[in-house]
Amino acid sequence: MMQALTMRSWLATLVTALLAVAIWPDPGQSLPQGAPETVCDTMLPFHSGGSVLPQNSVSPFSVETSSSTLGQGQTLRVDLTGVPAGLSFGGYMIQARNRNPPHQIIGQFGPARDGTIKLMNCENSVNNSATHSNAGPKQQVILEWQSPVDFLGQVVFNATIAQSYNEFWVGVPSQPVQIVRRDLSAAPPLPTQSPSAPAGTTRAPYVPPSYVAPNNVVAVSSDPIYNGCGQSKNCFGFPDGCVATKSCTSITVVTVRGDVFEFEIQSGKGTNAAYVAVGLSDDAKMGDDLTTECVPENGRVNLYSSLTSASPYSAVRSNVNQNSARLLDASIVDGVIYCRVQRDAVTNVQGRTFDLRNGKYHLLVASGSSLKENSVGYHDIGRLPSAQPINLAEVQDLSGSSRLLIQLHGAFMIAAWIGTTSLGIIFARYFKQTWVGSQSCGTDQWFAWHRLLMVTTWSLTVAAYVLIWVELKQAVWHAHSIIGLITVILCFIQPIGALFRPGPNDKKRPYFNWGHWLGGNLAHILGIVTIFFSVKLPKAELPEWMDWILVSFVVVHVLVHLIFSIGGMASERHLSQRANTFQMGDMSHHQQHAMRNGMSMERKMDAPYAGMRKGLLGVYGVVLILFVTVLILLVVLAPIEQFLGKS
């Protein structure tokens, strides 16, 4: 009898052990029936009795919502996916929580038709959380979530996602979703209210701090992004000085807490920005800058890191570690882009090290209205670098870098080589037989004007050359600078050569005339070519269509030369016909003497068609002033797109 009992006991133990092994979860799988309601508060899996801890690395999974704004009582699509797409996971748990205290669970999830979603009742409410109904591998989960009818404010979806039994991430957040009145979806969000359903005590370790993006009916002065500027955080935006007036077209805010570097970036209202970005630069010039871009795509704001290139302008994302920055918060409300980003203290990009703890950097704020494939477009809305490099941890008032010297350099060179040089050459070539007998400062009119215009060219060129050296503080070699240097050298040679001009009857005078003509025209041509090359310089920020204005000027200038040349030939023919009217051999001595006296008198008179030359000179002068004015305005107001966009 005792032996039979012992045998039954042994069999019972064996069966129990076998059953235990059969139902014991596979270490490579999540819990087959989903998360229990005992973890509603923590969302922390109790795998292997709690001995398996959540991963502390960046989650390879994301929580995406179909919209960043939702009306009360409306339905929202929520997607759980891997990054990159196709990465599978086994289990999950998700719930939406109020961004503001008390961080209670908000809304309800809808059941799946195929039964793949298990709904949970947390905090004495129904279906306000969801988990998996089976632990099989899945690449995407699509859920439907309905907002309460009595809640206004922002919610964040938090998820726990398990790739395997031993690998899971807790607190994977979505971007904030703004719950607004259903009948007034564009109205400003009211102070956050709790829904009527009772709320238990909850924790919120993974819910980002509160930030409500501004909208077009909230006063600019109430925008919280400006709070603490210059006191607890660095703020910089454009146009220059906009932080003080709280009216920035784009702004970045830098907050440093130990080794934590947070950047807030926001576009302005009514700018129609396609992106907003901030760069870290050693020299305040475009090129080799670490850039953080916030780009709205498919109803959500995405974060990208890139390295800029100066010529041609580009912001390249390849070979830049996209995990060097993490998106903590983002929204787009009424066209205003906002994101809050945490960057690593040290980032290595293509052999360059950006050390935010020890380095000093210029802040470059930029925004534009267009995107390229895998890149942002040109910053036509605006761009501004800070005047001085700063240690990001040192809070201070920042001002924009001045472009005055660059603008003066460009304006002086345009006035010199498009304006005064063009007119000076016209006087020297076509007006030696005009205003004959009239003098200024003891010299013929044509020479007085030619000398005045060329001295002005020399003065403007020297001043512009000095200004750009003061700005750059170093030699920069590219087509614009090399051809420009040759032009400056020729500009110096011309007046020096003029000091050694041979006399009118000197046998060397023709050689001087040809050399002076060649040097002057070569300098003029190279000066205009140099201006063409300036259009492509990123620091100039000139529009590409400025090339067509320059081409138009060249066409007009060549056409004027052609008309003057034809007029000159007609004048010479007229004089020749008058001289050949009588044959000298048929004249008496008295007649020949009278003829010579008549020709001598003609030399003291203007050549034929002087009125035409004067009239054409007046028209050309007016057109030249218009060209110079337009080109200087493009330089001084660069980038001109920001003004054209406001008109």
Curated annotation (Swiss-Prot):
The chain crosses the membrane at residues 10-30, 408-428, 452-472, 480-500, 515-535, 548-568, 616-636. It is a multi-pass membrane protein. It is found in: Membrane. Its main location: membrane. Residues 372-570 form the Cytochrome b561 domain. It is an enzyme of class 1 (oxidoreductase). Its cofactor is heme b. InterPro entries: Cyt_b561/ferric_Rdtase_TM (IPR006593), DOMON_domain (IPR005018), Ferric-chelate_Red/DefProt (IPR051237), Reeler_dom (IPR002861), Reeler_sf (IPR042307). One of its GO terms (cellular component) is membrane. Its EC number is 1.-.-.-. Keywords: Electron transport, Glycoprotein, Iron, Membrane, Metal-binding, Oxidoreductase, Transmembrane, Transmembrane helix, Transport. SMART domains: B561, DoH. It comes from the Eukaryota. Glycans are attached at N127, N158. Residues 245-368 form the DOMON domain. GO terms for biological process: intracellular iron ion homeostasis. Residues 25-195 form the Reelin domain. Heme b 1 binds at H409, H480. Putative ferric-chelate reductases reduce Fe(3+) to Fe(2+) before its transport from the endosome to the cytoplasm. Belongs to the FRRS1 family. This is Putative ferric-chelate reductase 1 homolog. It comes from Drosophila melanogaster (Fruit fly).
